[in-house]
Every structure is written in structure tokens, then in C-alpha cells.
């Protein structure tokens, strides 16, 4: 799986480099990397919120169809988090290329 992630990160870096120039300073690189890291954290936080609220309802025997909808939301957020993590990796690589 690690190899596949590295391939996706390389593709993301290539795409980003076609759209945007290399970073002009450490400050710029930091800001871009911070934004991507914050977006990753936001997705993770949303998963945690869903899990916490789910636990409250699961103890009350929540309907399985409602639980499946919660799992769909968790899955969607996890996919988003994976995409953000790949962007973090790509921006780390871009930083090293830039400076």
C-alpha cells in the first residue's frame, strides 16, 4: 500500500507543479503545508465527531439502517482524509524541491 500512496503523491505533486510554481520561500511553503495539514485534521475531527455521536445512539439500539448511514459518512470522510494526506505528502516533497 505504501508504494501506491507514494505513486499517488507523486501524481499529486506533478499536478500541483503544473498549476503552481515552486515555493518562493519557507514562509510560502509552510503556509501551503499548514493549509493541507489543517484540512487533513478537519476530516479526522469529523470522523471522531461521528464516532462519538454514534456511540451515544448505539447504546440505545439505534436502527441498523441509520448506523449504516453513519458508516457511509465515516467512509466518505476517510476518503477525504486520505486525499488530504496525499496532498500533505506532495507538499512536503514540493517544499524540498523548492528550497
Tell me the role of every PLM-derived stretch.
Residues 1-99:
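Flexible "arm" and connector segments at domain edges
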Amino acid at each position: 500500500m505504501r508504494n501506491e500512496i507514494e505513486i499517488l503523491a507523486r501524481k499529486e505533486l506533478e499536478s500541483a507543479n503544473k498549476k503552481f510554481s515552486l515555493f518562493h520561500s519557507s514562509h510560502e511553503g509552510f503556509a501551503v503545508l499548514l493549509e493541507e495539514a489543517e484540512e487533513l485534521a478537519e476530516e479526522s475531527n469529523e470522523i471522531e465527531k461521528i464516532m462519538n455521536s454514534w456511540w451515544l445512539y448505539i447504546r440505545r439500539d439505534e436502527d441498523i439502517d441509520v448506523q449504516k448511514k453513519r458508516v457511509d459518512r465515516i467512509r466518505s470522510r476517510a476518503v477525504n482524509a486520505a486525499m488530504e494526506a496525499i496532498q500533505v505528502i506532495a507538499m512536503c516533497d514540493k517544499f524540498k524541491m523548492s528550497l
